[in-house]
Amino acid sequence: MKIPFIRCYANGNDFILILSENFPDIEAKKSIIQRLCNRHTGIGSDGLFIISPSKKKDFLLDYYNSDGSWETFCANGSRGVSLFMYQSGKVGLKMKFETGAGVHWSEIKSDTMVVMRMRTPEYKSEELNPEESAGFFVHSGAHHFVCESDNLEEEYVLNLGKRIRQHQLFQPKGINVNFYKLGTDGTVEI
């Protein structure tokens, strides 16, 4: 079976993008997604988007983690999808799209800048401290643990992020982990 796809990269993550007309609607969807996302035997990616027509908005997005599980939303990858949809002539510079977490908006500013407007997070926890890293549980369409850190070096973030993701507080599924640093000029580095 041949499935045409696009690969995109956003903030250190990579994603496979497939138009729904090119993806078979079959029972084996989960296993196909697992095989495609496998970095050793497949294309390899952090997740996969299936892009479908929408009767209400510009398009509909279904996001799947690399293990084949469906997730309501992935903001990072949605930026890549937005750029692809614009560059392929399917939408204009500004677009609205449906996800499992509701409607989101994006605007193409350049080939390297996509601005997203997301809905307000549904809830946030009291401060949690897994792996001695103070932060908050936030649901912005997908589950995230967000913590401030002065160190955003890749090795540090990967090692601590992996430990937090697998911490017993977030089992059995784990959690997306984000580190941020506040700049003196009011910017936020993620």
Q: At which residue positions do the language-model features occur?
A:
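A glycine-rich beta-to-alpha transition motif near the start of alpha/beta enzyme domains, typified by
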Residues: 1-110, 146-190
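Short, surface-exposed, charge-dense and proline/glycine-enriched linear segments
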Residues: 73-84, 122-129, 141
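Active-site glycine-rich loop that binds ribose-phosphate moieties when present
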Residues: 118-135, 162
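Internal active-site segments that recognize and position negatively charged phosphoryl groups
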Residues: 129, 133-154
